[in-house]
Amino acid sequence: MNIGRFLLEKKYQLRGETNRTPPYSYTKLCKELVNIKELNSLTLSQHSEEKNINKKRLLIRHDIDHDLWTAEKMAVIESKYNLRATYFVLHTAPYFKKKFKETMEICRNIQSLEHEIGLHNDLITDFFMNNLDPGGNLAELLILFKEEGITISGTASHGSPIIQK
């Protein structure tokens, strides 16, 4: 038996029934969300600036811990349905350092779809593991993004397992 196929089938086994595809799709979810009347899709920064607290709001946040390429696909789907999201890029993730140029290109693509980019900061882990000063590290990261034409709209703490020990 093909182990990959077995794992896929095991992953999507619901109440004893095996489905060869997940019981949902992100496209289907987005399609359902846009059918909600008077729902206003905002990025996190747009939400913080919004004054009318009586409006229905949808805030989508993605922490890109592992798979930048799937995040880009999700951004395209959201854009198709006129949904906005905030994508937090993890600067300590393997994709960030090993594929920096591609990471920046994908961030620009996501940003061009009217989503925003934030920093999924892991500054304390960088301090303990690599002896990098958090303030200086943050300043360097912000300069890197700015030089690549990417606006960083905010930050979200990563909560690395290394720090949680």
Residue ranges with predicted function:
Residues 118-120:
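Glycan-processing catalytic domains of CAZymes
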Residues 1-61, 65-86, 90-104, 108-114, ...:
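Terminal accessory/targeting
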